[in-house]
Amino acid sequence: MKTPLTEAVSTADSQGRYLSVPEMQAAFGRLRTATASLDAAKGLGAKASSLAEGAANAVYQKYPYTTQQSGNNFASTPRGKAKCVRDIGYYVRMITYCLIAGSTGPMDDYLVSGLAEINRSFDLSPSWYVEALKYIKANHGLSGDAALEANSYIDYAINALS
């Protein structure tokens, strides 16, 4: 998984040199935001279950047909609802991984690269997940720098789905 810091070190090492001043400044910049990112990851992790449940309910309210149509891809049964909550929880988990890594690398590697194909294969609407992520962004309970850090990755996921 690539992060700005690992890329800088890899580039410098492949060129047989020490990190440049701008590369070190970027690394120190990441270290300054690391505390806020870790606080955000802890906060999201602690509330992941309730956020996923609430986000699923927000999807059901905006798109009521998701609970009315039968089929494996809809939430008309308890099993379907559980799968919806599980999938939304996966997005929350990816966001926490990004917060810890300090980059979109985890989301790029494990989610975004195959997202369109997965949604197409299972006939899932990206708009459902966009709605869920908007709910999470509005209700995560984070504030200050932790909220800014979390929101940047939530926005990245929303843009990847749009």
UniProtKB/Swiss-Prot annotation:
PTM comment: Contains one covalently linked bilin chromophore.
SS bond list: none
Keyword Chloroplast: no
Ligand binding ((2R,3E)-phycocyanobilin): C84
Membrane topology: Peripheral membrane protein
Principal location class: membrane
Any one Gene Ontology cellular component term annotated for this protein: plasma membrane-derived thylakoid membrane
Family: Belongs to the phycobiliprotein family.
Protein name: C-phycocyanin-2 alpha subunit
Organism: Pseudanabaena tenuis (strain PCC 7409)
